[in-house]
Amino acid sequence: SVVLSTLLKYRKVIPCIHPAAALREYLARYNIVNDLRRAKDQAGFPEVKHLTRDLILNPSFADTMSFLDTCNKAKEVAYDIEIRGQELSHIAFAINPSVAICIPFVEGMKDYWAPDQEASVMLKIAEVLENPEVAKIGQNLSFDATFMYYKYGIHVAPLQDTMIAAGILFPDFPKGLDFLVSLYCDGEPYYKDDGKEWFKNPFASEEIFRRYNAMDAAVLMEIYPKQVKELERMGNKITYDRQKSLLHPLVYAGNKGIRMDTEGMVKAGEGCNERIDGLTRELAEASGRTDLNPNSPKQLKEYFYVDKGIKPYTRKGSISVDDKALKRLAMNGHQEADIILKLRHERKMLGTYYNMKLDEDGRMRCSFNPVGTEQGRISSSKTIRGTGANLQNQPPETQAMMLADPGCLLINQDLGQAENRVVAYIAGEHRMINAFEKGIDIHKQTGSLISEVPIEEVTDDQRSDGKKANHGLNYDLGYKSFALIYQMPEKQAKFIVDRYHSVYPGVRQWHNSVREELSRQARTLVNCYGRKRVFLDRWGHELFKVAYSYCPQSTVAEKMNQDGVLFIYDRQDLFPEVQFLNTIHDSIRYQVPLSVGYERIIEVIKAVKASLEKPITWRGQSFSIPADTELGFSYDKKTMVEWKAHYVDNTHDDKLAEELEIYVREQAA
């Protein structure tokens, strides 16, 4: 913000983060430098120069219809919605950075329009939003487009999203509109709190809130063109286009949701309560105290570190009784810590999962975020109505309660050991590559190499150690953290970590090459799909660990998004029967009506499998990740049929269709 000082007459002021903050939060240095550069530029002239904006805040019916007609003829417009009580209260449109309108639907506690006028306005809004010739620019359109689709059946298209662009350009930075305005809008005074104040008091100034809404649309027309130039300069415009194309399938899947076994959730919650009661009694017996509250950090610190005299565990310089600290205490034989961890787990299962608020039709829905993680993965959260949950991190217990719609079959197809395979090929680790290409059990091989026993003699425990190593050590996890995560003695963890890197030397050689590339290429890495990421945080081990994970994680995300989600959603000419439901990092979920026939279901499975298994190319070498398939009437792995990739490859379609028919009959019996 560039504003006039209230203390020094005729002086301009630019609020700035204190430079000392960069010592604690390294990324703040970029904001500080940006503000100081702006201060230098602003020092060249005395005036406060802000872009003049013509904001229509009290539109007549004629004004509104005329403006929307203008929008309908534009190449692109920006829009922003505001919601109150799950109803559309305002919508703003901008045709350029200087001209915008706020179309209100409420004024205080009254309607702004007569019923016939409101109907005409909404129809005209729908015409603009669905016009295929007019690009709609927005911020976090997953929210806006979901609401307009859920509430009015309006399918907003085509879309351009400044939040997605921000997530591609600078994954380390905030993606909120307030931050983007500070970055791209040349000193525009901060206005975002105006909206928050109105929501606290809807009887406050209508004009202030309407200006806030109109500004949100106007600034988008200023921000987006600058982002496009940066994306093109960075070589990430294609990456942005790919990520943006996920909006429509994610809006569809978020609104579709999945049917839940509501009776099963109630019963599971009752069982959870019984276990909580039992664990509470166990804790009282183990501690000798009936008043010890497992949710009180103050009481737990006092109990473990004062009463019991244990040396305190710290986190960022502060005494801690978080889950990591409790795991360490439990590993050292303190039974109370183990009981508290179990209590926390049961309470989370009860509060977060079994007692979650579903929609009235008994479905779990979510809101997907196309740039929810820094590495390109999709994330999800509760819906804008406060129902549902993160659909991607549900534990096995609640996944087992996810049901197919009547007459449908659920299908889950996942990439086998996807990240591990990508690591093997980009690291050039020949032992790993050999195992994957010859179909050798990679966990068994790693267990064999660590334990120095023939692979045919590897025990279940040794294979388990191999599996833990394969899952945990590709990104330079230290032995102490490895011990904590897998709850084993540090001596054993150190042995496994050292042996792993001894038998797979290519992994640490690859780490060296990543560090060299960061240094040589201005902190920039490129994944197998050409997606570039600049790593801006403090140079050192923590940044390096994130960088090691970038190429494998983002490559798998791109593979799943392009050859899974978009392949199914965009090719409705091939898959008119397929209903896309969810994507979870390295897997895709959908359902198909049984009425299409078993042969057709096998055709669909094989087509999706072939798409997922398209080769990935890394520096001249191509490799493929096999896709396994699970089928069932719920996502309970105990009741699903599992077909490994090689089994589907080597089994005739008629045989697979016959197996599926037998399974369906058995489940119906």
Where are each of the predicted segments found?
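Acidic, glycine-rich two-metal-ion catalytic cores of nucleic acid-processing enzymes
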Residues: 73-99, 108, 115-120, 127, ...
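Mixed-charge, glycine-rich, non-catalytic linkers/tails in nucleic-acid processing enzymes
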Residues: 47-55, 156-162, 168-171, 192-293, ...
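Glycine/proline-rich loop-helix segments at beta-alpha junctions forming the active-site rim
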Residues: 1-50
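Conserved RNase H-like, two-metal-ion catalytic cores of nucleic-acid enzymes
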Residues: 48-179, 183, 273, 424
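Extended, well-ordered alpha-helical scaffold/bundle regions in very large, multi-domain proteins
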Residues: 238-336, 475-514, 600
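Core structural elements
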Residues: 89, 140-141, 187, 212-227, ...
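A short, charged helix-loop
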Residues: 9-21, 182-208, 217, 221, ...
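Acidic, low-complexity intrinsically disordered tails
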Residues: 46-58, 62-65, 112, 636-669
